[in-house]
Amino acid sequence: MAKLSLFRGCIVPNRYPGIEKATKLCLQKLEVDAVDLPGASCCPAPGVFKSFDKATWLALASRNIVLSERMGRDILTVCNGCYGSLADANIELKNDPEMKACTNSCLKEIGMEYKGTAEVRHIIEFLYKELGPEKLKSFITTPLDLKVALHYGCHLIKPSKERNLGETEAPVFFDELVEATGAKSVDYTDKMMCCGAGGGVRSGHAAESLEMLEHKLACIRNAGVDCIVNACPFCHLQFDRGQLAVNEKFGTDYSIPVLHYSQLLGLALGFSPDELGIEQNAIQNIEFLAKIYEISAGLR
């Protein structure tokens, strides 16, 4: 199994440090060799830098990759956006000698060189390929009696030819990891729809972003689930704090709990909600919190 450096990104340490803690606890329990990546910067955001200034995007992304190369480790992300930016940059630099040379001319100014010796992994992709659902089940100590609305997000599965995760229009690999915890992944209308956060939509087109989110939340609520599970802190932010904005704009009363997969897995591995930072969410659904505390205490 590959040795990893953990790339935290921006939203995790600044808004949801519980996701970082949950990820580290899970990796330790699963006996995965993962350490921090000192000196890392923003990935940078793929929908912004890559679209407007490709050379700067590659220089910034490659710097992060080189930090991990120097450690002799692959990079592990817990964010779809970071994964999209770093993985796409890595692929581009490995397959375009001219762009690699141009990028290395920039890196040379800070004493660095991109060699292409590190791979970029996403926590979901890594767990699915390196452990798999069946092996993951052997680590579960607290099966979760939860009904879950799973959100894949965009950059985890696309561009499909570069992700190598099989079917991308109706994927099942993430569902299988969710169900390895004992939870039930419930199908719902427009499951594969974007949450409305990425591509500059949340920051540049707030009204449209909230309309997309409200539609998705309505579909999820109609499915009768206990919570939403995602694999991206930006999607997590959209579903969590975005519910408050949706309620204010549309007069709705959404209060659907939101978990990153690391937090869901952490519960199934026997860690408490407090250890996993679940209380850091803006949405605090008392009924759901009571349920997961009971599950954690072995009362369900």
Swiss-Prot record:
GO BP, sorted A to Z: methanogenesis
Keyword Metal-binding: yes
Coiled-coil intervals, chain numbering: none
Pfam families the UniProt entry points to: CCG
InterPro entries the UniProt entry points to: CoB/CoM_hetero-S_Rdtase_bsu, Cys_rich_dom, HdrB/HdrD_reductase
Catalytic activity, reaction form: coenzyme B + coenzyme M + 2 oxidized [2Fe-2S]-[ferredoxin] = coenzyme M-coenzyme B heterodisulfide + 2 reduced [2Fe-2S]-[ferredoxin] + 2 H(+); coenzyme B + 2 oxidized coenzyme F420-(gamma-L-Glu)(n) + coenzyme M + 2 reduced [2Fe-2S]-[ferredoxin] + 4 H(+) = coenzyme M-coenzyme B heterodisulfide + 2 reduced coenzyme F420-(gamma-L-Glu)(n) + 2 oxidized [2Fe-2S]-[ferredoxin]
EC code: 1.8.7.3, 1.8.98.4
Signal peptide as annotated in the record: none
UniProt remark on cofactor binding: Binds 1 [4Fe-4S] cluster.
Gene Ontology CC annotations of this record: cytoplasm
Enzyme class: oxidoreductase
The keyword Metal-binding is annotated on this UniProt entry: yes
MF terms in GO: 4 iron, 4 sulfur cluster binding; CoB--CoM heterodisulfide reductase activity; metal ion binding
Subunit structure: The ferredoxin/F(420)H(2)-dependent CoB-CoM heterodisulfide reductase is composed of three subunits; HdrA2, HdrB2 and HdrC2.
Family designation: Belongs to the HdrB family.
Described purpose of this protein according to its UniProt entry: Part of a complex that catalyzes the reversible reduction of CoM-S-S-CoB to the thiol-coenzymes H-S-CoM (coenzyme M) and H-S-CoB (coenzyme B). Catalyzes the transfer of electrons from ferredoxin to CoM-S-S-CoB during methanogenesis from acetate. Electrons transfer from ferredoxin to CoM-S-S-CoB via HdrA2, HdrC2 and HdrB2. In addition, the complex can use electron bifurcation to direct electron pairs from reduced coenzyme F420 towards the reduction of both ferredoxin and CoB-CoM heterodisulfide. This activity may take place during Fe(III)-dependent anaerobic methane oxidation.
Protein name listed in UniProt: Ferredoxin/F(420)H(2)-dependent CoB-CoM heterodisulfide reductase subunit B
Organism of origin: Methanosarcina acetivorans (strain ATCC 35395 / DSM 2834 / JCM 12185 / C2A)
